[in-house]
Design a protein with these regions (language model features):
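Hydrophobic ligand-binding cavity/cleft-lining segments
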Residues: 1-44
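Short beta-strand micro-motifs in enzyme catalytic cores
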Residues: 2, 50, 76, 103-105
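Hydrophobic/aromatic beta-strand elements that line small-molecule binding cavities or substrate pockets
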Residues: 6-8, 62-68, 91-98
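A generic beta-sheet turn/junction motif
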Residues: 10, 57, 100-102
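A short, structured loop/turn motif at beta-sheet edges
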Residues: 14-15, 68-73, 96-106
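Glycine-rich portal/gate segments that line the openings of hydrophobic small-molecule binding cavities
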Residues: 26-29, 38-86
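Beta-strand/loop substructures that line and gate deep hydrophobic ligand-binding cavities in soluble
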Residues: 79-108
Length: 108
């Protein structure tokens, strides 16, 4: 299994970044490739087990399930259930940490 790690520093306080990230249906507001998104079955977007269904700018669709969410650790983990892009057995974990030299956030 391949493993990819990405990280960046966001010029915003961790509380504000986490508020957006913990909403599993918010990525159409900040991810440039996502056009529209909705949570299936009317579940809350921070409910572990909820499924988001979204469309990309190129017309592809992806369904992902939230499998873990920790406010104390500021960690979110999700997996792809179905996709029209060639991704299989995809699991992602995002963790936020405060940057100590300012009001910024480390996304890992």
């Amino acid at each position: 299994m391949q493993r990819v790690t990405r990280s960046t520093v966001i010029d915003a306080p961790i509380e504000r970044v986490w508020e957006v990230l913990r909403d599993f249906n918010s990525h159409d507001r900040w991810h440039p490739a996502v056009v529209e998104s909705h949570i299936e079955s009317g579940e809350a977007s921070d409910q572990v087990g909820c499924v988001r269904n979204f469309r990309l700018r190129d017309g592809n669709h992806i369904r992902e399930q939230l499998i873990a969410l920790s406010d104390s650790e500021r960690v979110s983990t999700y997996c792809i259930l179905d996709a029209t892009v060639p991704l299989q057995r995809y699991v992602a974990t995002v963790q936020l940490r405060p940057v100590t030299d300012g009001n910024r956030t480390f996304w890992h």
